[in-house]
Amino acid sequence: MFNQKIIEQASGKLTGSLTKSSSLVSIEKERDACGVGFIADVNNIANHKIVVQALEALTCMEHRGACSADRDSGDGAGITTAIPWNLFQSGLKDKGIIIQKNESIGVGMLFLPTSKLQESKKIIENVLKEENLEVVGWRLVPTVEEVLGKQAYLNKPHVEQMFCRSSNLSKNELEQQLFLVRKKIERYIGINGKEWAHEFYVCSLSCYTIVYKGMMRSAVLGQFYQDLYHSEYTSSFAIYHRRFSTNTMPKWPLAQPMRFISHNGEINTLLGNLNWMRSREPLLKSPIWKNRIDELKPITNKDNSDSANLDAAVELLIASGRSAEEALMILVPEAFQNQPEFNKNTEISDFYEYYSGLQEPWDGPALVVFTDGKVIGATLDRNGLRPARYVITKDNLVIVSSESGVVQVEPSNIKSKGRLGPGQMISVDIISHKILNNKEIKTSVAGKTPYGDLLKESRQILGHQAFFSEQQVESKKLMQLQTAFGYTNEDVELVIEHMASQGKEPTFCMGDDIPLAILSEKSHILYDYFKQRFAQVTNPAIDPLRESLVMSLTIQIGHKSNLLDDQPVLAKHIKLDSPIINEGELNAILESKLSCAHINTIFKVEKGPNDFKKQIEQLCESASQAILSGNNILILSDKNDILESEKVSIPPLLAAGAVHHHLINKGLRQDASIIIETAQCWSTHHFACLIGYGASAICPYLAFETARHWWSNPKTKMLMSKGRLPACNIQEAQANYKKAVEAGLLKILSKMGISLLSSYHGAQIFEILGLGSEVVNFAFKGTTSQIGGLSMEELGQETVNIHSKAFSQVKTKKLANYGFVQYRPGGEYHINNPEMSKALHQAVRGYNPEYYNSYQRLLQNRPPTALRDLLKLKSNKQPIAIDKVESMENILHKFCTGGMSLGALSRETHETLAIAMNRIGGKSNSGEGGEDPVRFKVLNDVNESGNSDLLPHLKGLRNGDTASSAIKQIASGRFGVTPEYLMNAKQLEIKIAQGAKPGEGGQLPGKKISPYIATLRKCKPGVPLISPPPHHDIYSIEDLSQLIFDLHQINPTAKISVKLVSEIGIGTIAAGVAKGNADIIQISGHDGGTGASPLSSIKHAGSPWELGLSEVHQLLAENQLRDRVTLRVDGGLRTGSDIVLAAIMGAEEFGFGTIAMIATGCIMARICHTNKCPVGVATQREELRARFSGVPEALVNFFLFIGNEVREILASLGYKSLDEITGQNHLLIKNTDIELAKTRGIELNSLININTHTWTKFNSVHTNGPVMDDDILAIPEINDAIKLENEVAKHFKIANTNRTVGTRLSGVIAQKYGNEGFKGLIKLNFYGSAGQSFGAFLASGVNLKLMGEANDYVGKGMNGGSIIIVPPAGTTYEDNNQVIIGNTCLYGATGGYLFAQGQAGERFAVRNSLAKSVVEGVGDHACEYMTGGTIVVLGKAGRNVGAGMTGGLAYFLDEENKFIERVNSEIVKVQRVITKAGEQQLKNLIENHSAKTGSLKAHNILENWNTYLPQFWQVVPPSEANIEETNTAYSSNTITAY
């Protein structure tokens, strides 16, 4: 035991964070990730070795987990095995208890409250007695508490096992009975022990399996639970799990495995899944449960984690008679719509199609390992976003794990090796002694029932109906309708008309600089109070354009059937290919066999806003009555023949949400679908909101009518005739609009990492800004609304205000333009207005304090725009003299510029910003796109005119200046990220998201790719460059931790920052980032600028930094993590007052983007996305760049003004430094002098009056600890080779725990020689299983050879050298059919060679720039976003080859003639090798591969060249179409015949 002093110390330091939950965090916001796997003996031979191997495997994945604030208490580790009867028998014998073989006995592994031990055991025993089960006995689990970390120890439950038996039930019957028993126990304890119920938890209660787990590190699990290393603890299988949680509050029950599953990943759709499961409960029936089904409810629990809830859903299905494999197929389905293999196995797609109408997918990155004690298996999510490698041995072991090499197997004992692909499953049936692959499992499950016949009987597919070909209302009435429903001129011209013309969403630039809807004096429609949420860190966004094969907008409407039916029956329903339906399609639904109720959503104004809620309640009652009358489609419609001033439409979002939740509460939600027929829906955000709150389909009749009027306008037809607009007919215009909305919807889904509309439907993945609890609880229950806002009455009044404008006495010929998007005099206030910009330009160009004071006054006297405008400062201290305040220099060091890329900005602007920031000791940020090495030099040749030959295009220079950005960004495209780039940084920023478009990637158009930009980005001029929505090496929190490790590895002196965007739940994400060893966390507000972004993203994604920063600071402080990181904030900072307020909320550093550009010369023309910037700031056109007049001095002056203002405010508050006020929220009070036009219901409690925590300021750089590269660099011969540029060769053993090998060595070389200068040769030979990121950022002159296998990210960012990977000696399996390297290899590689004698995983060569490689098979998405280099694949390829590929060449051997269907042909074309140059390029690489690896496959191809050459395909993007390797017109030698 710990001694008392240690316990007291731990209590003093930690108890506050352990016993009090954060005000800003709940379990729903907690995120986790992990390492997971299983070992199973196919022959079901139980032995102790399997348990020991599982514990060792767990230890080998310790790096995938994390620890609590004490750095010792693990976030969780655990193991599931068969029940070790021999061990228990010997222990129970001492108590006189004998267990007979094959007796029906269950074992409960229990966490019991130490203070209520006897009370809880009494409840358990009473329930068992009620259920006619005998309590055989109790067993205290032997534990060693000393090995626990402090937090884990302080929160340790009492761990005891309970044995019970049945005299009349079979084992399977007892297993089902124990499910009922557990639910009953939990319910009784919830009623009788409310105060301590949270301390009670059933790890497992089964007659087949048992779970040992807890809040501990991997190595501690077997030390704590003494049973696990007992020789009599035998099992034929073991599942193991190591957890990485974003939260540090110790929760023993959240450790995994759960009762049936272990889960690595995150369920993005959790809230929707919970809502739908609750709504599904009234329908649940099963003969197994007879009349006791209600005792199982609730099935899920919003207070549990996503993994626990998925486990509960799996448990329900298994206990109700489904196999474990079938349960997972139903809940986590494969992407079946675009699978060529299913064309021959339609029964599988029929199965998935059938269940898509009953159960929405639990969507998100997931490797799920599962067992019911009879079958052990694993399945991967539809996108394949988690790694899963397997080995099958000759002695019949199956090993599946997140990483290869965690279980040691002799090479000669390996029968086969592989990986699970997207949506695939593997299982081991230990009863029938079978290993089942994906096809066998799914064919077996799907073949049991004729699902195709059931679909034919019950499903109607809604065919496309023609759009109206004529206008339905006259122009005058149209404008009145548009006004009544809240349209503005911008909505029509910038949104609807653009979409009708172009078929895509409008793009805009800069950011959202108008007041939040709740702060605005102008009326806003309800949608404007909702902000879209998005994926960052804990799960990835998806690319809806390049990965459309996994996405679908399909939805089914009608009555839902019972999920538990043992004889499947599907209710009549209609399948829609899209939730956006036109008037004809709505009529077709009305005329279908389904019963439809048309419910009007008009309320009468004469009763006043007071009656608003009552009339919506009447609407809800009408909906439930319609269902009880037999209707299974509810059409909520605001369509009225006559528009009247006294009859106002209930906002459709309010109507949808209110009816949706009302029906859930009444138990009727599954009986009908909701369709919205509305005029008030036109932007993609509107559609997303309606679907998110329960609508299955929307008919936006007024938007379609607006498109028809636009097409009919003579001006439109004239522009079409002149070619200034694309020509289309009236129906095509409406189709274009619909197409744009659908594409926008897919983007909104994908930015949250969701693939299917059915998973987004009802998921409520939004954050509310400006609605009070009355409104939220009524119609949007479960959605976070942190700041309160409008009451029902106030919302009713705003609704009436919008409607009444349609009946104004003032007659106009055009719709009102309030300037919500573009600044206009008299319109909505924009912070970035001409008056402000002019004052700032005048202030900084000559350091004029008078003009700065004018600038300051303009911002101080603005209308309330941001949340901070509602606050004011209050200090109990006396003011001090300004000379007592910290120096200007100290303050300036805390300033940074935002990450603005060279490419979006001109070279002149980018370098001017960097020079200015270096002068003041601040930090500029490179943004994405690399940096010219010339900028790393210090200027010493500046003449009296301020010019330098080194940077001749700049003005106002000084000797000693440097244009190197102190912060180098690593974004998803990895453009220009080389070893030299990384080594010339003081900080390395991982950009996860951008404030103006979080969850989205980017695209730099070809017209901005000048020769200079192309050189930096390692691509060809004029070729568009795509930055993926996610980092393809960050799909989870432990992946981010790995990238942080990689960057600390190459440059151990640089701090690593992670840029996040403010949203609800960011605190838990930040906690995970801090635990992942980041040095800096940056929180960006929603109002940050951008060079180009969809308009709907600028307006509707992200939240204010005030909320995000406060949440992050508070949660980190409460969880003892605040001293691990520096917090930086950006997004609309413009004054010293902003800096002080941000510091009080927790910020220590401050980023400036838009305002820094304005100070440097930007005039806010807001045309950045066009490449036509009139002042040369945001363009690559040379004639426009020549107009750039900015000099570093102007930006220096701006920051001097800001710094001086900060010092003045600090002095007035009585504080000497920013550090003294950091996180001191008590200095903020609500400014009661400000009265908002709309409400007095704003609540700022999350920003003010918060407990102040103390912490030690973080200054140092985190380290990776001892690593293999340190040992390599400690070898004198290696050092000599670097110093003298000699050749040296060394040999090493390697394990999966040796990560990022070769990278620190590469950093040392790049620091000394740059990317190209090293002329020596360092050969390193390894034997074993390499950890992640083997050879990442490899430098020229370093050759790595591995005899064994490697995990994910091989060659990530490599710039030179070579990586050769071959199977170990003694292998007898066929090399080319085995997986030898993991996922996402060669990501962002800028050079070098990779030869792998085996298959690669998913996303091979993603965003490859210049590397060349040969591998012998690849998974899905090979060569995605590739911009250069050459890839050869000598084996099978997965789907979606070449998606987003704009450069480079790839050759694929197609022996089965199936390759063409696997190519994404949106950009690339596929052809045979038709020129001698192409043939020679291919042959040379294969010859190299053969020579380097000894590949038999390569040797055979070369020996039979004329036979194999015709079987190769060449994948050619447009940029490579006219070169000698691809085009006979450019080649002197062509291949005329084979």
Swiss-Prot record:
Molecular function terms from GO: 3 iron, 4 sulfur cluster binding; glutamate synthase (ferredoxin) activity; metal ion binding
InterPro entries for the chain: Aldolase_TIM, ET-N_metabolism_enzyme, GATase_2_dom, Glu_synth_asu_C, Glu_synth_asu_C_sf, Glu_synth_centr_N, Glu_synthdom, Ntn_hydrolases_N
Compartments reported by the entry: Plastid, Chloroplast stroma
Residues binding [3Fe-4S] cluster: 1162, 1168, 1173
Keywords: 3Fe-4S, Amino-acid biosynthesis, Chloroplast, FAD, Flavoprotein, FMN, Glutamate biosynthesis, Glutamine amidotransferase, Iron, Iron-sulfur, Metal-binding, Oxidoreductase, Plastid
Pathway: Amino-acid biosynthesis; L-glutamate biosynthesis via GLT pathway; L-glutamate from 2-oxoglutarate and L-glutamine (ferredoxin route): step 1/1; Energy metabolism; nitrogen metabolism
Catalytic activity: 2 oxidized [2Fe-2S]-[ferredoxin] + 2 L-glutamate = L-glutamine + 2 reduced [2Fe-2S]-[ferredoxin] + 2-oxoglutarate + 2 H(+)
GO cellular component, one term: chloroplast stroma
Binding locations of FMN: 1109-1166
CDD domains assigned to the protein according to its UniProt record, in alphabetical order: gltB_C, GltS, GltS_FMN
GO terms, biological process: ammonia assimilation cycle; L-glutamate biosynthetic process
Family listed: Belongs to the glutamate synthase family.
Protein name stated in the entry: Ferredoxin-dependent glutamate synthase
Species of provenance: Porphyra purpurea (Red seaweed)
